UniProtKB/Swiss-Prot annotation:
Belongs to the cyclophilin-type PPIase family. PPIase B subfamily. PPIases accelerate the folding of proteins. It catalyzes the cis-trans isomerization of proline imidic peptide bonds in oligopeptides. One of its GO terms (cellular component) is endoplasmic reticulum lumen. SUPFAM superfamilies: Cyclophilin-like (SSF50891). Inhibited by cyclosporin A (CsA). Keywords: Endoplasmic reticulum, Glycoprotein, Isomerase, Rotamase, Signal. Residues 196-209 have a biased composition (Basic and acidic residues). Residues 39-196 form the PPIase cyclophilin-type domain. A motif (Prevents secretion from ER) lies at residues 206-209. One of its GO terms (biological process) is protein folding. Glycans are attached at N140. This is Peptidyl-prolyl cis-trans isomerase B. Its EC number is 5.2.1.8.
Length: 209
């Protein structure tokens, strides 16, 4: 091999290496696909707090995401509008979705009273994640919670299916409301309006396993 061909070979390897590094640096962040977006307009007592926009991971957990989406729109004749956040624990989570009893003992899914855990591909790695509340294995209904800190002890027990896209400051306001017995807000924190936002799907910021 002469000097010219050796130089060309080296240059080719160098160029390919640079291209691979550039591709690694510029590729989109990994994350589950957000297939739909829903919103909650929140009031605390008579005071409007603002809007929370939630992105749902319909590719990773399609059944769970569809349940939440349909309950947010109320298209099945029942759903989240008018329900409350009945349990709020600072530096942990805010919980809602019990639109039948309002105390954490009720609620139902669009598939019947309960449905099975879909999968545990996603972990509770940060604040602002949307996950199913349950009473044990395969007891998902309509109740959900939004994390306000990482909660790794819930991994493998609760199905993560979305994230807060906008309005996390509203979540923080809910997290800090005065509470009474059972971590229930002293004044009602209500979802006064809910629905779906028609928008193009985007990537979430949660890493898939």
């Amino acid at each position: 091999m002469n000097f010219k061909s050796l130089f060309l070979s080296f240059f080719l390897v160098f160029a390919v290496g640079l291209a691979l590094v550039h591709a690694e640096e510029t590729k989109e962040p990994r994350g589950p696909k957000i297939t739909s977006k829903v919103f909650f307009d929140i009031e605390h007592g008579d005071k409007p707090l603002g809007r929370i926009v939630l992105g749902l991971y319909g590719k990773t957990v399609p059944k769970t995401a569809e349940n939440f989406r349909a309950l947010a729109t109320g298209e099945k004749g029942f759903g989240y509008e008018g329900s409350t956040f009945h349990r709020v624990i600072k530096s942990f989570m805010i919980q809602g979705g019990d639109f039948t009893r309002g105390d954490g003992t009720g609620g139902k899914s669009i598939y019947g009273e309960k449905f099975a855990d879909e999968n545990f591909k996603l972990r509770h790695t940060r604040k602002g994640l949307l996950s199913m509340a349950n009473a044990g294995k395969d007891t998902n209904g309509s109740q959900f919670f939004i994390t306000t800190v990482p909660t790794p002890w819930l991994d493998g027990r609760h199905v993560v299916f979305g994230e807060v896209l906008e309005g996390y400051e509203v979540v923080e306001q809910i997290e800090n409301v005065p509470k009474g017995p059972g971590d229930k807000p002293a004044e009602t924190v209500k979802i006064v309006k809910s629905g779906q936002i028609k928008d193009e799907s985007t990537k979430g910021s949660h890493e898939e396993l």
